[in-house]
Amino acid sequence: MRLLKWLEDVLWPRGLGCICCDDLCRGRLLCDTCQKALDAMKLPYDDAAKDIRSIYRYEGVARQLVILLKDHCAADAATVLAKAMADAINAMKLPEDTVLTWVTMPDIRRKKRGIDHGRTLCEAVSSLTGMPVRQLLVRSKNGHTQRGLNREARLKNIADSIRCEGSIDSTVVLIDDVLTTGATVSVCAEALRKAGATKVIAVTATKVVLSKR
């Protein structure tokens, strides 16, 4: 078994394979095929939703990257998603004192996973924008998971559970991985505004887009 493992490491060293499909892509995180598939998931800019910017449809490679980030805390997945998010933020020409924060995870889930994937994504965006990260949001209670809930149920689930710790008097960019109904983002944005944020802009890596029938 050790010999087989040695041969595998020699012939297929770690770090040379695509993080989504394992195809060889020396020096890059995504192979050409997965990168093209990810680019095809990009959402057009919606001028009517200036306070919420979602980069990719929550499908295909984009969805796979979010799952890697959320369920496996994969920093490489955060790096890939953060690139387009940072490009979008830099294009906004925000004030110099703008700070980044993230949608906080319930303590019980954070302790179970050992890491907060939202913070990982936020810090990856920070490294590309130069904007500082502040932990502003905290959960006052541990709600149930939001997965599978509609907007009304999500709002009820997190009602009064998110608050802003301390005060803030600048523009805040709220980072999240998936926008589903917008309920969680709305509650977080309201908490930030109550704490004094002059403007809150949510930037999410992906968005669930319902198919039109």
Regions found by a protein language model. Name each.
Residues 1-176, 180-213:
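Glycine-rich phosphate/pyrophosphate-handling loop used in enzymes and phosphotransfer proteins
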